[in-house]
A protein has these predicted regions:
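Solvent-exposed alpha-helices and their adjacent loops that cap or buttress functional pockets
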Residues: 76-81, 117-118, 143-145, 169-170, ...
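Adenosine-phosphate binding glycine-rich loop
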Residues: 179-180, 199, 304-414
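Short, ordered loop/turn segments at secondary-structure junctions
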Residues: 90-92, 100, 129-130, 155-158, ...
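General beta-strand structural signal in soluble alpha/beta enzymes
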Residues: 126, 152-155, 176-179, 210, ...
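Glycine-rich phosphate/diphosphate-binding loop of Rossmann-like nucleotide-binding domains
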Residues: 95, 100-120, 178, 182, ...
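N-terminal ligand-binding/catalytic initiation module
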Residues: 3-176, 403, 407-411, 429-432
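Rossmann-like adenosine-cofactor binding region
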Residues: 253-323, 329-331
Length: 432
């Protein structure tokens, strides 16, 4: 079991933020150094005498070995596999830091493992690979399949992240989930479901413009399409993406271009965002201006998720006419935080011994998150549950497990209510 334990502007207006950042840096370095990381291995059983030793190791350990040899599915009953996820990275696309390599990415992977344990009781182990070679990464993960019940791919740069995930989904029989893609997409769409209720619009009627064609942006567009959004334009650094664009394309963009921007509109973000109902940003600071927001449709919805500084600050977006604004930051309302998704998704998938995390399971997670915001509580500053809402992971786990069973990818049938209750008991958050 694994247990959780740039240049700065110093003008007058930013002194408080600088002090905060300096303090955060010092506290973070101290915390990581004093504990020598955030994880340690702890035994579930005591070994205090000869009898304990004979059960935990030789000769008693031979008995579960023989059981598993006769029936490999029993590995889920007799070992940690049924509750163990590998958090795999090559360190090429670490949020806010970029390509920093495997060693420097390890604190992030440890942190991810802490969140798995804290929010849903899932044991997770960080694995930072010293290669960017797709074939080597795929082969390495495949070789680890006997040990892990699932794999969370993390901070792997596009387009490799797409290729690696697709290959592993085809070549393994355990859940493979690239959280940078799907976690962000699930929480974003859950927020949009509720935001549309507020402004009285339907998925089938809206125009969505997304800025940023990396892992998260592509996944958001794909999930929105499954939800019935048909008027979608995606932009990257070269402007609007369309079928047949001669430059700046790759196979993933080519695929998306076949079902988005049907009129093959060219131009910049400023050109295509005019008349849009929704802006989704997974790009860069300041990409969306107040003037652009003013050209959008009435009751515009803005998800500005660039970190640490969003595409537009919430107060500026609202002043320009936006009805609802979400960001990736905890100091603003409507934080789009992946922790609302991935712990519960893996909890549900593991508990039914799922062979994959399919589209229906992702959509079930969207529904689970969105439904936690009651109609009488829904408002412009509350469209997404808070990250520490203890109801989230249990509901997501139950909904995801149910979807897995209904779509035939579960190897075990379990009452979803039991899974929800188990998640409540295992989670470390929400306890007195």
């Amino acid at each position: 079991m694994v247990r959780p334990l740039g240049e700065i502007d110093i003008s007058k207006n930013n002194l408080r933020r600088v002090d905060s950042l300096s303090t955060l840096r010092e506290e973070a370095l101290h915390m990581h150094k004093v504990h020598q990381g955030k994880l340690e291995t702890v035994s579930k059983v005591k070994v205090e005498n000869a009898k304990d030793l004979s059960l935990a190791y030789s000769p008693g350990v031979a008995e579960p070995c023989k059981e598993i040899y006769d029936d490999k599915s029993k590995v889920y009953e007799y070992t940690m596999k049924g509750n163990m996820v590998a958090v795999v990275t090559d360190g090429t696309a670490v949020l806010g830091l970029g390509n920093i390599g495997p060693e420097a990415s390890l604190p992030v992977m440890e942190g991810k493992a802490v969140l798995f344990k804290s929010f849903a009781g899932v044991d997770a182990f960080p694995i930072a690979l010293n290669t960017n070679d797709v074939d080597k990464i795929v082969e390495t993960v495949k070789l680890m399949e006997p040990t892990f019940g699932g794999v969370n791919l993390e901070d792997i740069a596009a387009p490799n992240c797409f290729i690696i995930e697709e290959r592993l989904k085809k070549e393994t029989n355990i859940p493979i989930f690239h959280d940078d893609q799907h976690g962000t997409a699930i929480v974003t769409v859950a927020g949009l479901v509720n935001a549309l209720k507020l402004v009285g619009k339907k998925m089938s009627d809206i125009k969505v413009v997304a800025n940023g064609a990396g892992a998260a942006g592509i996944a958001i567009i794909k999930l929105l399409y499954r939800y019935g959004v048909r008027d979608i334009i995606m932009c990257d650094r070269k402007g609007a993406i369309y079928d047949g664009r001669p430059t700046g394309m790759n196979p993933v963009k080519d695929e998306v271009a076949k079902y988005t921007n049907k009129n093959r509109i060219e131009g910049s973000l400023a050109d295509v965002v005019q008349g849009a109902d929704v802006f989704i940003g997974v790009s860069a600071e300041g990409a969306l201006t107040e003037e652009m927001v003013r050209t959008m449709n009435d009751d515009a919805i803005i998800f500005a998720m660039a970190n640490p500084v969003p595409e537009i600050m919430p107060e500026l977006a609202k002043a320009a006419g936006a009805a609802v604004v979400g960001t990736g930051r905890s100091d603003f309302a409507n934080q789009v935080n992946n922790v609302l998704a991935f712990p519960g998704i893996f909890r549900g998938a593991l508990d039914v011994h799922a062979t994959q995390i399919n589209e229906e399971m992702k959509m079930a997670a969207v529904q689970a998150i969105a439904e936690l915001v009651a109609e009488d509580e829904l408002n412009a500053d509350y469209i997404i549950p808070a990250p520490f809402d203890a109801r989230v992971a249990p509901q997501v786990a139950a909904y995801v497990a149910k979807a897995a069973m209904e779509t035939g990818v579960a190897r075990r049938q379990v009452d979803p209510n039991e899974i929800a209750e188990k998640t409540k008991q295992l989670a470390l958050i929400g306890k007195e």
